[in-house]
Amino acid sequence: MEDASHGYVYVGLALVSLFVVLLARRRRSPPPTAHGDGGLRLPPGPWTLPIIGSLHHLVGKLPHHAMRDLARRHGPVMLLRIGEVPTLVVSSRDAAREMMKTHDMAFATRPLSATLHVITCDGRDLVFAPYGDYWRQLRKIAVTELLTARRVNSYRSIREEEVAAMLRAVAAAAEGTGAAARTVEMRAALTALSTDITARAVFGNRCKDREEYLAQVDHTIELTAGFNPADLWPSSRLAGRLSGIVRRAEECRDTAFKILDRIIQERLEMARSDGAAGEYLIDVLLRIQKEGGLQFPLAMDDIKANIFDIFGAGSETSGTALAWAMAELIRNPTVMRKATAEVRRAFAAAGAVSEDGLGELPTFRLHPPLPLLLPRECREPCRVLGYDVPRGTQVLVNAWALGRDERYWPGGSPEEFRPERFEDGEATAAVNFRGADFEFLPFGGGRRMCPGIALLFHFDWEVPGMADPTKLDMTEAFGITARRKADLHLRPLLRVSVPGV
């Protein structure tokens, strides 16, 4: 059976502890099909139970797997009731296009769960800020100050230095033979790489409290991903108290913010002693705060909440995506040999991988780091594929299901890892993987693939003690990001020398 993980423990505890307490408030949920209140044509969905709604349909599988199976029975636009939260699940290209393009303004905001209220300081970050003037202000700062092409390119040397440091560490592991041979745990190594790159871009140097900070990032992901009572029954204060989830979220936020406080204080002291701030992201935010003139002045908690976003997005998703890419290559030796040969042929003259030689690479169809895209919320009543979506409905796009839909991925099983799908002459060669084609909604590509390509260029890889790599365990873990359940320990074999080693 697929991983049910600790997230479902919350469901079990909730069923036991809340059923009696909330029984007096029990209402029979209206069937999420046909016509609802006011003659609305609501999307179809599975039958519900009092209090828990549709939760019993999700237990025993990973949520994105269970939702894909339910959508096969009820359709690509499906209404669930997760606890007391009405949730629209979108599982087709056409439905995703209507939601994210045709009615993008209606779905432009995100819901804030009890845990997210705590972690984001009541939605003061760019990712979860409610749609409105404050969000537009943050987006303008991101587009015109933080993420300009010039600024991103200015950090190229940081990326290259950190990738080189990782390659040297892997080369050292490859030197051992026999009993002395060492392995590399890929997700940990790649996540650490992404964290170090992010830290240097944000602060100007590596975060000396990296391990503690990463632990808080991991804890945050666990807290926001689980089916916990505070988020399932937001109208019940008792649910939050019973679960203790809000208290744990506060502890996680406070620990992470204390680390950021120390770093920010160092940057402020450096700016005072040097007479000018640097060009790192923290300096930019502090400069904007000092200059003022904003409609909504930036408080220090606003700055810390947005830095927390940058680290969460910059390290967790990159490490997860690259670990899956390596696992798929290991499990498909023919594809691995072809990819390695092409990479070495492309960069042979240079002797190393550089960003100049990279195109955008569609790698994340089977394993999008966010299998259920970050939730949105319907701001105003609208219709999707002919169904009415009431205001306040939470919306989830099942990107994992879109990437495995046989209607969009002909030429073999959609579960098959076959990069040739994107080559010229293939039916799917013209698919745009930057978000224009809604059957494929990956979470990135481009520069972040540089570390993975460098690992193929310099090393061959093998799974210690495994004669048949096609048997590699590919089970996913429960969480907001779809990590591998098992660590990926690989043995590197040096094939192209690493500069500086």
Regions found by a protein language model. Give the residues of each.
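Cytochrome P450 proximal C-terminal region
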Residues: E2-S17, P43, V163, L190, ...
